[in-house]
Amino acid sequence: MGQELKEKAPPNHIGTIIFQAEEQIENTPIVELGKAFTLRFDDLNADEAYYYYTIQHANADWTASELFKSEYINGFDEVRIRNMSNSSATLQSYTHYALNIPNRDTEIISSGNYVLSVFDDKQELVFTKRFVVYEQQANVQVGVFRLRDLEGIDSKQRIEIGVQTAKINTRQPDQEISVWALQNYRWSSARKIPKYDYVMNQSLRFEYDNNLIFEGGNEYLFFDTKDIRSAGGNVAYIRRENLYQSILYPNYVRNGTVYTYAPDINGNFVIQTTEGFNPNTDADYTEVTFRLRSSETNYDFYVTGLFNQHLPQPVHKLEYDSANNLHQLTIRLKQGVYNYKYIAIDSAGQLFENGVGGSYWETENEYLALVYMRKFGDRYDRLIGVGTVSYTHLTLPTNREV
């Protein structure tokens, strides 16, 4: 088995990586074959450096596929990102880069999993991002429900997946079809659903496997820095030094408390500014200070969200302030609305995803099902269908196809 192609976090001078498909708000490209998507990022060195990109095809399990580049790209990659512009009237200078695909050099021609890598002019890897390209072949339905078992009934959610096979010519679906599911577009939550449970009306039904059960988690916390000069949502106060500083209200450990509904964007972020017309180059950066009220010192606490690819990185570790009985961290983020959460890691390196926020069956989450096909003799996994479902305890589960 090959090595999994994981996402690599960028260095500190690279900020605000946005990776979106056309007409999607999710900051994770789920792209229909032939449609467009865009990568954006800022270089806070602001020196108009040259960056280059490559694209690698992967199997359903994110190991490198056997395809030659000419089999999944029309044209070529290893091309410089030419679209760049400098920030305008901001305290923090930066160069903004944008890569649109397809472009005159690169067109994706095969479905499946992909990893886009960005390199500097010394050919050193800067960061990587995953994306998927699908063919609209299989109709995929996803439902989400409260767990039936008493163990976990208050903290977990269960999904069910149906894959219509009428339009996909398969005689051995147990060998040719593979299904993966993930929560809130987080690749770290992805798991394979080993086998369908039964067939009904030409639909493969996945309903009983334990990999269909997810911790509900809790609603993400949020803050709003659209107006850099005044305190927005969950910002306690603003002060000005070299940059504006946004000091957030202290958060508390929610694990063990009663669930409270609060609308969120499932860990995402949206760049916005009240000053300027183009947030890509007019939005400024602010020093955001996170504060977690806790006397716990047996765990390391990290702040995560899509803004740092949900990865607990050393630069996002909170430091304990014994005088004020809280853990805090200051990082530089572009103006906008952000979701975030705290995670805990013990001295043995074990990660507790919901140790701070708790886990509740009522939590609103979005689930994504990816359906792959590899027929006998094929050399790669085609992504033939995608389905999503959003769940909130205030409404019935709703299905939508991508």
Features from the language model and the residues they span:
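Low-complexity, Pro/Ser/Thr- and charge-rich linker/hinge segments at domain boundaries
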Residues: 5, 133-156, 361-384
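Contiguous beta-strand segments within globular domains
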Residues: 15-57, 153-163, 278-289
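Aromatic-rich carbohydrate-binding modules that target alpha-glucans
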Residues: 73-97, 187-194, 287-335, 347-374
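Aromatic sugar-binding surface patches on proteins
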Residues: 89-101, 200-219, 323-328
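Conserved small/polar residues in nucleotide/adenosyl-binding loops
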Residues: 392-398
